[in-house]
């Protein structure tokens, strides 16, 4: 087995370092797994990951979000709570963020080169502004509002 030193490997190593420096384990783990895949016999699975990775990730994320409801740690509100203005606002924000995410998936599909900038921006926001890595999909969706074309 010989290691491949190319621009993609360099990008992945850079993302790993930024993830470590920015205390962003999601970026660190993801870039490490992809680097290991690229450098080993697992490279044959990269097309599968490319094709289905976002959908699988969204499924896992949805399971994580719904788990506290299923476990009983988060109680469902009664019907009267659903008509409170804060609940309406929460639902509206949820719809807006889901829409941003959809636009983000489209933008990343049509302009994948922007993903690096989105990741670096997310890492910088976590490292220096006390932010939380909520995800490149939402960032890409917001970016699509500024640059247009989503596919």
From Swiss-Prot:
Q: Which UniProt keywords apply?
A: Cell membrane, Membrane, Transmembrane, Transmembrane helix
From what superkingdom does this record's organism come?
Answer: Bacteria
- Cellular location(s): Cell membrane
Q: What is its main location?
A: membrane
| TM regions (residue ranges) | 1-21, 52-72, 81-101, 123-143
Database matches in HAMAP family: UPF0756
- The name on file for this protein is UPF0756 membrane protein HS_0993
Naturally occurring in which organism (per UniProt): Histophilus somni (strain 129Pt) (Haemophilus somnus)
């Amino acid at each position: 087995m010989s290691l491949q030193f190319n621009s993609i490997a360099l990008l992945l190593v850079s993302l790993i370092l930024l993830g470590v420096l920015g205390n962003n384990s999601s970026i660190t783990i993801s870039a490490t797994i992809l680097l290991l895949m690229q450098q080993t016999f697992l490279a044959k699975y990269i097309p599968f990951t490319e094709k289905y990775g976002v959908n699988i990730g969204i499924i896992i994320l949805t399971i994580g979000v719904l788990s506290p409801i299923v476990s009983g740690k988060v109680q469902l509100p009664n019907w009267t709570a659903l008509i409170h203005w804060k609940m309406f606002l929460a639902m509206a924000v949820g719809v807006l963020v889901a829409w941003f995410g959809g636009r983000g998936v489209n933008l990343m599909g049509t302009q994948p080169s922007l993903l690096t900038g989105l990741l670096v921006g997310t890492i910088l926001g976590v490292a220096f502004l006390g932010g939380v890595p909520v995800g490149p999909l939402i960032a890409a969706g917001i970016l699509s509002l500024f640059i247009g074309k989503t596919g």
